Amino acid sequence: MQFIDQARITVRGGRGGDGIAAFRREKYVPAGGPSGGDGGCGAPVVLEADSNLQTLLDFKYKRLFAADDGRRGGPNKCTGASGKDLVIKVPCGTEVRHLRTGILLGDLTAPGERLTVAFGGRGGLGNAHYLSNRNRAPEKFTEGREGEEWPLQLELKLLAEVGIIGLPNAGKSTLIAVLSAARPKIADYPFTTLVPNLGVVRRPSGDGTVFADIPGLIEGAAQGSGLGHDFLRHIERTRLLIHLVDAGSEDPVADLNVVQQELEAYGHGLVDRPRLLVINKQELVSEDDLPKLQQELKEASGRPVLCISAAMGTNLDQLLAETWVELGV
């Protein structure tokens, strides 16, 4: 399935139904008064968060969403039927903004959470409203009003508590596959992961914690280079980052600094997010050199450094233990 995390749509509330001019016509009331009913209200457009959706793909091919119009009024002061609400399902984690102003209208994070994004127009008034002492047989009625119409920007930010970050080929997909039931595409070349992958990792209590494998960052990602700019938004909601550094890299310290700089450039508080610094693929470094590398990264980052091998399953229990401590679970 194609992963789409941004979409532009237009929503339009239904038009209100027209009021009508009508008069009572009964056998023994030859000169009945006005009885024109009001028009029904136009339907609103409502967005609803749905936990079964993972992408905004549905909005790639359909951009205009128009709700039902209200019905016109009827005789005997009958009000026309209102339009049925147009409910549009979106993934949990969808932010909704006005396209032209950028104003945040809502952030749908909980399943079933709703946001009305366009109200329908009010129904028109029937001529029964215009009866007066001066005019006993008014012909006047009003038309229904147009519904609201707005251009919207939808932006999906995945709901994950833990984000796994690092340069391409650092082993992020392997780690999430080993820790969870996720089955991302894995290969030994950069940019194998082209979309974020989610996996659920069980806590000691048995509850699940969502981990996200974010496609590899490169230098300049925050300015749009590579894949990082498109997907950094998906770690904005995380509570913890696991930063993987490839032990087999030519310059692991430089790799560390690239990711650090990109987090700083992107902003949104990512650089201050709690983070575990982890050397992956420790089997690629000799037992004598591994402590040296660990010390170099510690001095460069000011953080403790864990050593693991996702592929070999080495020290993963220690990594998870540190993760649960950071999350307070």
UniProtKB/Swiss-Prot annotation:
EC number: 3.6.5.-
Keywords: ATP-binding, Cytoplasm, GTP-binding, Hydrolase, Magnesium, Metal-binding, Nucleotide-binding
Domain called OBG-type G: residue spans: 160-328
Keyword GTP-binding included in the entry's annotation: yes
GO annotation, cellular component aspect: cytoplasm
GO BP: ribosome biogenesis
Any one GO MF annotation of this record: GTPase activity
Subcellular location: Cytoplasm
Gene3D superfamilies (alphabetical): GTP1/OBG domain (2.70.210.12), P-loop containing nucleotide triphosphate hydrolases (3.40.50.300)
NCBIfam families assigned: Obg_CgtA (TIGR02729), PRK12297.1 (NF008955), PRK12299.1 (NF008956), small_GTP (TIGR00231)
Official protein name in the record: GTPase Obg
Organism (species): Synechococcus sp. (strain CC9605)
